[in-house]
């Protein structure tokens, strides 16, 4: 199977939550010859719709114990080839951990599984049904030569791959160890967050607990990105990196101290009343040190978001306080391909808009309705708010999102959480949302982003300790506080400490 590099921010989010947990691997697995048991998975084991392409022991290295690595391909329907990798450690803790990916997937890495293996988890991963060298360009696998949608692969990517990876993974674990996993958990961010919600909604029996970070759970992430791109591509509206730095400093000057602590992080960007016109150029100012009228207009537009004629959201607002992290997500400041700035919509114009040659410059708020009613939206979006089957079986869901995420909107995740609480009886005992101030997409940003999500999920599922506050720290920084179960947020106090309010 081909391997590709996973988005660094996604890996950082996964590794940060795994690394600090104090729980160690539990009892050793039943006595057996690991090498023989591993080889037998390729030579003798038979799994439905699956070809095991390799199974071999990998020696221990540093913090990783020796493990059996199993690679295979699942072919549930014609045209489908779902690559899977399972890593089965010697010091198995009798649990399984499935890991999501980022972007349009197409990648499986050891790096993503390292911390889980170190703690004794059998890890489960998939390429989501295709190989893809760039996280934002889906054209190589999602589009047929005639320009039509490659529906088998798009459905694999949307939900089928992660489910089949899980069911097969449980069988592989049981075959290798001679015992079923006592618990199965899932962790992912971005696309991985969407996959986590998809599991909760479509396949509620797969996992005992799910961590879904910054979920790109509807195509509004892509439509929002496209509308923002067009706002900054208007004549005279382009922003350069120095403009973003200028705006960031002005926002903090206007709003930072109002949340109880002038620490470089806005606790709740929604409360910030910064007005872009305060940076408008006056006579004699250098263009890099101020904003021209078109730039002010574009900035106001992305701060406010856009709506359809019906009043429904077309583009979520970009929240204030995270401007220093906008570079990758604003067309004028990024040198990448168009997909980098529109969330990959450029390559999927055919499946989304019914026209493979659609001019994206003509994308408007009303085009959003066509995207949201497309066939792809029907299989891709994880927007079901009634998650009763998952809740009834005792499943636990931790949602989290950085408040400075310039990709999928934090507000969209809050919107989903609040709707699910209303739609699902007793979900308040099965679901938590944590909003992390100053944290960008799946990690990074100015706020503390090292949070032990997996330990929190284990404590909830295995010890009935529902998470309410979780310590958050930042590498090479003294800035730290507890992230709080929403709607509470960490708030600065007069003594320099923070509390959840």
Residue ranges of predicted features:
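Histidine-bearing beta->alpha loop at or near hydrolase active sites
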Residues: 431-444, 476-477
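Conserved alpha/beta-hydrolase "acid-adjacent" motif
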Residues: 407-411
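A catalytic-pocket lid/entrance helix-loop region that shapes and gates access to the active site
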Residues: 198-200, 205-307, 435
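Cap/lid segment of the alpha/beta-hydrolase catalytic domain
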Residues: 103-181, 224-225, 232-235, 357-379, ...
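Alpha/beta-hydrolase fold nucleophile elbow
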Residues: 179-190
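Short beta-strand/loop motif that positions the catalytic acidic residue
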Residues: 398-401
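Catalytic-loop region of hydrolases
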Residues: 24-95, 99, 110-113, 261-266, ...
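Glycine-rich nucleophile elbow surrounding the catalytic serine of serine-hydrolase chemistry
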Residues: 107, 188-198
